[in-house]
Design a protein with these regions (language model features):
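Short, cationic-aromatic polyanion-contact patches
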Residues: 2-23
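Hydrophobic alpha-helical interaction segments
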Residues: 80-143
Length: 143
């Protein structure tokens, strides 16, 4: 007999994951804050160690959101990151640096699910609109 299992309540599971990410995992990933020197679009990250998250990733995925705050996920150490990408440590800077915690890297951005979560957690009308676009284009088809 072939049994097929169906996941019910996938949207609520997604919401629960975002809440757990915000309260359990994300606080452990924070490295520091910086000021980004120069145009963010001219930063050429080594895609195996550093990618965009949050607003810049949303802009790259949707071409809809012009970033005001920046989020970088990286496996690089602090000194290497600052030197390589011309960042200035600044506890009030607009750029947050988080530890990259996944292995598979495709492209210039964090996985769409993570970008969506970052936008939802950051809040605001602009981020909500971009999050909805990402949800409908990248997440909902896979739920």
């Amino acid at each position: 007999m072939n049994k097929t299992f169906v996941w019910e309540y996938r949207k609520s599971l997604l919401e629960r994951w975002i809440n757990e990410y915000a309260t359990v995992l994300r606080p452990k990933l924070v490295k520091e804050r910086c000021t980004l020197k120069g145009n963010w679009q001219e930063k050429h990250f080594d895609k195996h160690t550093t990618v965009w998250g949050g607003e810049p990733a949303a802009d790259l995925l949707t071409n809809h959101l012009r970033p005001e705050k920046f989020l970088i996920y990286t496996k690089k150490n602090r000194i290497e990151l600052i030197k390589t990408y011309n960042l200035m440590p600044d506890k009030n800077g607009e750029t947050e640096i988080l530890e990259m915690f996944w292995k598979e890297i495709k492209g210039k951005t964090a996985p769409p699910l993570l970008v969506y979560a970052d936008l939802i957690l950051e809040g605001g009308k602009r981020n909500k609109e971009a999050a909805e676009k990402i949800y409908h284009e990248y997440i909902q088809p896979n739920l």
